[in-house]
Amino acid sequence: MKKYLITCLSLVLLVFLGDYLYYENGNLYLHQKGEVTCFTGSDRESLYLDQGSGLEKFEIKGVDLNFGKPGYFSTEGAITEEEYLRWFQQIQTLGANTIRIYTIADPVFYEAFYQYNNNNLKPLYLIQGVWVDEYLSNSSCSALSDEFSQPFLTECKNAVDVIHGRKKIRESGHVFPVRYKRDISSWVYGYILGTEWEGDLVAFTNESDASVSQYNGDYLYTENAENFEIFLAAIGDQTIQ
């Protein structure tokens, strides 16, 4: 009996540990690692998308989607999967091919997006935005400071994990964390890191430190860049990693 209880307890602990490492910590990566590939591209004049026949020119015909609904706050997650599915159909009927959202949505949005694209030969594409803390954006701090950059980088990485269906996020008003389990990465055209950057934040960052080195990362680098541009390159590079 004692061995049985120890075994059961060990299994429960392993399940909780695996759940934490996979959905919250992110260090448990079970998918096979191979060559990094990308189905989108760009040059100085055009955007490209690979829809099965190699990269071809792609014109984004986009719709901004917010999460408000009459009678509810946008943070309440009141929109149902059926409503999202109907909206996606109407958006595509308009002739649009891409949806932009400004921040991480409720799991229902990603579930509906997954179901819609799985059941349609012509999918919609998503541009995932990352929200910026409005309080910090209007505070007297540099974007290069840990106070600003670390929470923003965490939010960027959260967005990537959400898109790949491996994230739990603890939100106010929820007893338990909300879980994102649908991998929609094959329909994500790109990310927009940040919303409308405050001019004061940009100016303060550029003027706050004259000794900031140019950034040379694994995927992004800068040359003769201002401090704020260096910040954006560093955040983008670390998000890709």
Where are these regions (language model features)?
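N-terminal Sec-pathway targeting helices
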Residues: M1-L13
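Hydrophobic alpha-helical membrane-insertion segments, chiefly the h-region
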Residues: V12-Y22
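N-terminal carbohydrate-binding accessory modules
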Residues: Y20-Q90
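Alpha-helix termination/capping residues and helix-transition junctions
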Residues: K57, T93-G95, S185
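Catalytic domains of carbohydrate-active enzymes, especially glycoside hydrolases
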Residues: E81-F109, Y125-I127
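Active-site region of glycoside hydrolase catalytic domains
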Residues: E111, N119-Q241
